[in-house]
């Protein structure tokens, strides 16, 4: 496992997406989403130290749910930030930066379901 901070992981994840051909506008909006993640968890915190209860607190936090002026963020914006956070964490696990994925099963995945969906048992 490669040790890294939340900030280092966010930067490396954005770099990975850039190399994968994501558009600069997408990278810009994802970086803004990850700024919210860094503000909550702390940029210098070790990514591997993040646990499920802390993620739950993040999902309920004013940093995620409200704008700086106190107004509520649009549900679509909150969902996207959560999705980008999950994408980064899944990438971090797949790239050896963390061993366990500290995310609830109900976290939205967005358009690209990652390998986890193949790990689930089919019903029936």
Language-model features: where?
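N-terminal helical hairpins
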Residues: 1-3, 19
